[in-house]
């Protein structure tokens, strides 16, 4: 009972603190609305304080207007952080529901308090806050920590699904809702085709962050995880590009008609915006990697370079009306490959946790704003539009999933099963992106904006609460194929070997696939890019670098899980010995590294095998005599045992088929017959004597002189 009561008391403390913060936020909003003046500048504040000459110095003053904006921003961030802490206090709660559900509930609670105290809709974000401050950290974190190899191995299926799937969902939902709006009984006749298509583009933006958390816990197979991850990474960018193009069409349609040329220009702009954003991101990633080559002595600014250049890529792309989301994604992927090898380990840890912190805070604020906007007067309800929107989202999601994956499975070595496709269909959770795009619709172009916001909230609430909560049990019920354990160093080395081997086989056969593309890029990378972008481009063994990377990763994981704290601390005697050991100089370390590199690069020499074709001639007299003596002893022993000479076939013997079964009697009987035949034949002894005499004369000559001993080696071989 004691620990349970302590946990309950701690939970009640957190809940009470959350309530206090919500009341503070509500009171700050009331003060903001009741104050006739806005935020004062320091000069205006000084002028106001010095306007009355008879005013005395007061001991205590209250000036909320001066700190209003940073105070409220700090309160919002603190409220979001405490909400996440409270969510993870109960260890069972994250397994039952996604984190976004609790954040929406907390936001709805805050909105209810604000609306109840002042009877006015609570404050929400505008377009500049969302697109310039909240969205970039989320996209940067997703791109930087993306598993690169699985992503590019499935890049074809990801682009096929994320790109074409977003277009099918957007136009399918938009056209279906347009036909529903033509029914006069529903009272939706004032919503035209462009407005429905625009609503379809924003409602098709999925946000399966909660689903990815469930997949990581369930350890589903890698290709299923990468399809959902790739959709989450690219779908927002595609939806935002389509959203901006359709808004431009809506503005144009207000003043003039849209022609076929405008539609072709819109399609061309869709391609240029996407490709231009990727190009900008890669360029800024290369620039940041090149600058980090020279930061070995000032490593404190390395995290600043990473964040500033990634944010600059987003702003530069948005300045030229390109896709900032795709730009910052490409920049993050490029920096992940090159910048990590230049920055120190401390800078890498700082980048990792600061990036995750910014992404978590931004996403939490968006979900809380979503809950806040639920309560207020900015809603319009229409049963037909809301219900058909929810139905069409599910229908077109199913059509796009099963159609596109049926086509892609025809070209895949490992196709997606029906279970995988069902999980992908069920993972279409709408979230912060759809709500933000709906809330940022210009009211002058969309008179039914409140209806769009209401329908978006209903779809988001249904997918987040219902699908987000039930996706875990569904994965366990369907028994989706699980992933393998983490690759060991042996598996990693064999994967690299097989990639290189497959590229060579394809080159010999005249075929082409992604193995050759990867191999050519690796050669180009090692030959040019790494020499320019990497600080110390010295030839190192890939085994050494991979071992160092795995050891570093294992040490970080042990430090994060607390395993290093369980290791016994060294005794004072050991500490003295460690301190007494002389540290290696940089020259010694460099020489050791060179020795290891050379030895690991060298191929072990194979021992030569000798035969009669490569045997070197020997001129030693002792060796020739020894060979002759041993040969004579061998022949004498064979004759003493009653055996015939190996090169003489005794008379009357049969031709045996070797490497097959004999014709007749077993081995002992055959040996007896051969012995009887050979012992009674005097020609064998005479032939043996003459042969030995001829060999001696051939080697030593008729007068006993040594001739060419190498002839003996040839004869014996």
Swiss-Prot record:
Residues 14-28, 70-90, 421-441 dip into the membrane without crossing it. The chain crosses the membrane at residues 95-114, 128-148, 155-175, 192-216, 226-247, 270-290, 305-325, 357-377, 385-405, 451-471. GO terms for cellular component: apical plasma membrane; basolateral plasma membrane; plasma membrane; zymogen granule membrane. Most abundant in stomach, followed by colon. Lesser amounts were found in kidney, liver, brain, uterus and skeletal muscle. Predominantly expressed in the inner segments of inner medullary collecting ducts (IMCD) in kidney. Highly expressed in the cavi amnoni fields of hippocampus. Expressed in pancreas. Expressed in multiple nephron segments including proximla tubules, medullar thick ascending limbs (MTAL), cortical thick ascending limbs (CTAL), distal covoluted tubules and cortical and medullary collecting ducts. Expressed in submandibular gland. GO terms for molecular function: potassium:proton antiporter activity; sodium:proton antiporter activity. The keyword Transcription does not apply. It is a multi-pass membrane protein. Homodimer; each protomer has one site for sodium and one site for proton binding. Interacts with CHP1 and CHP2. NCBIfam families: b_cpa1. Electroneutral antiporter that exchanges sodium for protons or ammonium ions at the basolateral membrane of epithelia to regulate cell volume and intracellular pH upon hypertonic conditions. As part of transcellular ammonia transport in renal tubules, mediates basolateral ammonium extrusion in the medullary thick ascending limb, regulating the corticopapillary ammonium gradient and overall renal acid excretion. Mediates sodium:proton exchange in gastric parietal cells secondary to cAMP-dependent acid secretion and hyperosmolarity. This is Sodium/hydrogen exchanger 4.
């Amino acid at each position: 009972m004691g620990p349970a009561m302590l946990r309950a008391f701690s939970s009640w403390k957190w809940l009470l603190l959350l309530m206090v913060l919500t009341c503070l936020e509500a009171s700050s909003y009331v003060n903001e609305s009741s104050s006739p003046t806005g935020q004062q500048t320091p000069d205006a504040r000084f002028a106001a304080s010095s306007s009355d000459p008879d005013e005395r110095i007061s001991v205590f003053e209250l000036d909320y207007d001066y700190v209003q904006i940073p105070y409220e921003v700090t309160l919002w961030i603190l409220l979001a952080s405490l909400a996440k802490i409270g969510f993870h206090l109960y260890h069972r709660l994250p397994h039952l529901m996604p984190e976004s559900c609790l954040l929406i509930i907390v936001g709805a609670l805050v909105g209810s308090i604000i609306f109840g105290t002042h009877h006015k809709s609570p404050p929400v974000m505008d377009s500049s806050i969302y697109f310039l401050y909240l969205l970039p950290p989320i996209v940067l974190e997703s791109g930087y920590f993306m598993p690169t190899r699985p992503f590019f191995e499935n890049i074809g299926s990801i682009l096929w699904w994320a790109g074409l799937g977003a277009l099918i969902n957007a136009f399918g939902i938009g056209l279906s809702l347009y036909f529903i709006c033509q029914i006069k009984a529903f009272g939706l006749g004032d919503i035209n085709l462009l407005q429905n298509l625009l609503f379809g583009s924003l409602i098709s933006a999925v946000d399966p962050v909660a689903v990815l958390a469930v997949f990581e816990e369930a350890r589903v197979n890698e290709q299923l995880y990468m399809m959902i991850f790739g959709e989450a990474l690219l779908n927002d960018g595609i939806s935002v590009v389509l959203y901006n193009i359709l808004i431009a069409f809506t503005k144009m349609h207000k003043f003039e008609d849209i022609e076929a040329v405008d539609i072709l220009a819109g399609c061309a702009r869709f391609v240029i915006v996407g490709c231009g954003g990727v190009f900008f991101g890669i360029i800024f990633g290369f620039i940041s990697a090149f600058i980090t080559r020279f930061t070995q002595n000032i490593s404190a600014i390395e995290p600043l370079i990473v964040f500033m250049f990634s944010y600059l890529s987003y702003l530069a792309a948005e300045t030229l009306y390109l896709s900032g989301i795709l730009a910052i994604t490409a920049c993050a992927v490029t920096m992940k490959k090159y910048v990590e090898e230049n920055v120190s380990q401390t800078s890498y840890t700082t980048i990792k946790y600061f990036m995750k912190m910014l992404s978590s805070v931004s996403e939490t604020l968006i979900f809380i704003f979503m809950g806040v906007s639920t309560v207020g007067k900015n809603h319009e309800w229409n049963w037909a539009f809301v219900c058909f929107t929810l139905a069409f989202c599910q229908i077109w999601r199913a059509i796009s999933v099963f159609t596109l994956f049926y086509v892609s499975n025809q070209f895949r070595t490992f196709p997606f099963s029906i279970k995988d496709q069902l999980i992908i269909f069920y993972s279409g959770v709408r979230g912060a992106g759809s709500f933000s795009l709906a809330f940022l619709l210009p009211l002058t172009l969309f008179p039914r904006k409140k209806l769009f916001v209401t329908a978006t909230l209903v779809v988001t609430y249904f997918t987040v609460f219902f699908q987000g909560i039930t996706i875990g049990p569904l994965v366990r019920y369907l028994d989706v194929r699980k992933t393998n354990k983490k690759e060991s160093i042996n598996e990693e080395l064999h994967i690299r070997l097989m990639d290189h081997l497959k590229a060579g086989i394809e080159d010999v056969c005249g075929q082409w696939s992604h193995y050759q593309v990867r191999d050519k890029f690796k050669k180009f990378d090692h030959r040019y890019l790494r020499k320019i972008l990497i600080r110390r481009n010295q030839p190192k063994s890939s085994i050494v670098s991979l071992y160092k990377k795995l050891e570093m990763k294992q040490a970080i994981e042990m430090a994060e899980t607390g395993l290093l704290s369980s290791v016994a601390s060294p005794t004072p005697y050991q500490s003295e010995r460690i301190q007494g050991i002389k540290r290696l100089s940089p020259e010694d370390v460099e020489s050791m590294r060179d020795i290891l590199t050379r030895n690991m690069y060298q191929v072990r020499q194979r021992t030569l095998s000798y035969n009669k074709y490569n045997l070197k001639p020997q001129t030693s007299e002792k060796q020739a005599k020894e060979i002759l003596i041993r040969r004579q002893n061998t022949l004498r022993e064979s004759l003493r045992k009653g055996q015939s000479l190996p090169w003489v076939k005794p008379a009357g013997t049969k031709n045996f088929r070797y490497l097959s079964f004999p014709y007749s009697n077993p081995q002992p009987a055959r040996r007896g017959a051969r012995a009887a035949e050979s012992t009674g034949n005097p020609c064998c002894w005479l032939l043996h004597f003459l042969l030995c005499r001829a060999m001696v004369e051939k080697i030593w000559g008729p007068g006993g002189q040594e001739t060419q001993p190498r002839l003996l080696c040839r004869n014996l071989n």
